[in-house]
C-alpha cells in the first residue's frame, strides 16, 4: 500500500506586526500571513539616523548586519555581542544574522548589505514591533 503524505504549509505569522509581515512578503516574496498585530511602518534609515531610531524605545533593541559590517555600529550606547552571548537590556545590541537567529527584539535596524534572501528573512523577522532598514 502506498503512503500518500499530506503537506501542510505553516504561513501564519504570530511574531511580527502586519507592517513587518507586509514588508517581508513584498521584498522577499515570502508567503506570510499576519494575525492582526498593528505597529509602525517599516522605516528606511541612513547609518547616521540609527541612534535616533532607537532613542526612547522600550524593550530589547538590535542592529543586525553581516559579520564584516558590524564594526560600522561600534558606537556609544551600542553593545557588540561578545563571545558569552549576553544580550544587553538597556543598550542597542549589535550582532550578525547568525547570532540573531532564534532571538526576538522590540525594535530592530537591519543593515542588509551583502545578505542573502534567507539572511534578510531571518534579520527582518527578529523585530516584534518596529523594523528599520539601513541603506546608504
Descriptions of predicted regions:
Residues 1-136:
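Conserved helicase motor core of SF1/SF2 NTP-dependent helicases
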Amino acid at each position: 500500500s502506498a503512503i500518500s503524505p499530506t503537506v501542510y504549509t505553516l504561513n501564519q505569522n504570530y511574531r511580527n506586526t502586519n507592517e513587518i509581515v507586509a514588508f517581508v512578503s513584498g521584498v522577499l516574496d515570502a508567503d506570510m500571513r499576519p494575525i492582526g498585530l498593528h505597529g509602525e511602518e517599516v522605516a528606511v534609515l541612513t547609518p547616521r539616523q540609527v541612534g535616533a531610531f532607537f532613542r526612547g524605545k522600550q524593550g530589547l533593541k538590535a542592529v543586525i548586519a553581516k559579520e564584516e559590517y558590524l564594526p560600522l555600529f561600534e558606537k556609544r550606547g551600542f553593545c557588540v555581542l561578545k563571545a558569552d552571548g549576553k544580550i544587553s537590556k538597556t543598550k542597542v545590541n549589535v550582532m550578525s544574522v547568525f547570532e540573531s537567529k532564534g532571538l526576538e527584539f522590540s525594535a530592530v535596524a537591519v543593515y542588509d548589505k551583502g545578505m542573502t534572501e534567507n539572511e534578510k528573512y531571518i534579520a527582518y523577522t527578529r523585530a516584534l514591533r518596529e523594523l528599520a532598514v539601513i541603506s546608504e
